[in-house]
């Protein structure tokens, strides 16, 4: 418990373990039956043992969904300024943590349906799945981002700009490469028919060829059943 609190403190979080548990209990009392928790890995001085305790805590809260992410140091953040002083997990340790998380979450009934997301059966995030399927969405309010009719745009965080209806455009999105990349993040994989329906032509042969090459090394596997053809990323293994 003390180690968990130290990890929390290193992240600059002010809530306690009890606060987190109370928040979940209050959400349930308010009538929410689909609750998700975020699980972080690769935190300074984190160990496999402390990660396992965090996973057990999430499961003990009896939530229906868990998102698990590896710490990434972004520019213009407090961690970025002191990253040379941080004892961060190397790539091998991060991989070990990820594999252990996948293994343990599965044993607790949280099935992986996307690279970083796990859920009890029937509780996969419809909101995020829409992003991974290149679906459209409209953001409302300052700083809100949207993707509509092939264009990405967002409102300024400034209330004045928002009130003046000022939009900033990020460019286009939802193209073939993005669709393929996001589909491969999903357990369900890249569906040939969905690609053809969305873009009006069949999946380029070079994509299938490349997937077959990776299949030899165990990185991908191709599945064909009746009229269904899929490309999947292989299960993570040590």
Predicted segment positions?
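A short, conserved structural fragment
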Residues: 216-224
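A short, hydrophobic C-terminal helix/tail in secreted or cell-surface proteins
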Residues: 233-237
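Short amphipathic alpha-helical interaction segments
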Residues: 201-213
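Short secondary-structure junctions
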Residues: 108-109, 213-217
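C-terminal scaffold of the Radical SAM
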Residues: 1-4, 8-201
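Minor-groove-contacting beta-hairpin "wing" of winged helix-turn-helix DNA-binding domains
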Residues: 227-230
């Amino acid at each position: 418990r003390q180690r968990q609190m130290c990890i929390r403190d290193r992240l600059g979080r002010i809530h306690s373990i009890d606060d987190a548990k109370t928040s979940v209990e209050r959400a349930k009392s308010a009538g929410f039956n689909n609750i998700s928790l975020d699980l972080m890995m690769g935190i300074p001085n984190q160990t496999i043992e402390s990660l396992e305790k965090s996973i057990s805590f999430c499961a003990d809260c009896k939530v229906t969904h868990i998102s698990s992410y590896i710490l990434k140091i972004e520019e213009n953040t407090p961690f970025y300024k002191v990253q040379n002083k941080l004892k961060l997990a190397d790539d091998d340790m991060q991989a070990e943590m990820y594999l252990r998380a996948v293994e343990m979450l599965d044993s607790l009934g949280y099935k992986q349906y996307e690279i970083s997301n796990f859920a009890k059966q029937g509780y996969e995030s419809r909101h995020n799945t829409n992003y991974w399927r290149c679906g459209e969405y409209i953001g409302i309010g300052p700083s809100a981002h949207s993707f509509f009719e092939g264009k990405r745009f967002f409102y300024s965080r400034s209330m004045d700009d928002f009130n003046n209806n000022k939009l900033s455009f990020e460019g286009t999105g939802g193209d073939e490469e993005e669709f393929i990349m996001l589909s491969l993040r999903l357990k369900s994989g890249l569906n040939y028919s969905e690609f053809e329906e969305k873009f009006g032509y069949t999946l380029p042969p070079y994509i299938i060829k490349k997937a077959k090459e990776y299949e030899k090394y165990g990185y991908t596997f191709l599945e064909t059943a009746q009229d269904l053809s899929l490309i999947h990323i292989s299960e993570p293994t040590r």
